[in-house]
Amino acid sequence: MSISKLITIAVTVAIGINLFKAPVPFETTTIEERAEMAGMTVEDFVFISSVVEAESDRSESLDGRILIALTIINRVEDDRFPDTISEVLNQRGQFSTVRNGHSIVDRTDYSDEAVIRAAEWNEAGDDPNVLFFNCVGFNYGTAYGYVDGNYFMEA
């Protein structure tokens, strides 16, 4: 894939992701309210948000974090993967931050917001079907885009 095509995809991804509604007023929301906004149990919400924080290396933009969360949510809905957030995140060979214990990090409002936005985007039904991401390159599926050092692939 050419550099110009990757840049075009990255710009398209960034523009599309930023079409979300106003930020959630996190200073006034409880963890229970945040989980409800995402349509998840508190346990699932905390787990996915912690993994998003760890996988993002605490440095990715909201766009990158949304795509990481969306990858997890999409896997739960895909027949080729386990049926729950916990099972997807604990699946052997996936999400190295879970396997090596690095997902035991403090969540941030930033990762919480990313999970909520990903869940909203998925619920709206017009989200990309990203199922894979890595920092090495496109190695499976169809290239979706490159955001914050990660390549995202659709199935």
Residue ranges of predicted features:
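Cell-wall glycan-active module
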Residues: 1-39
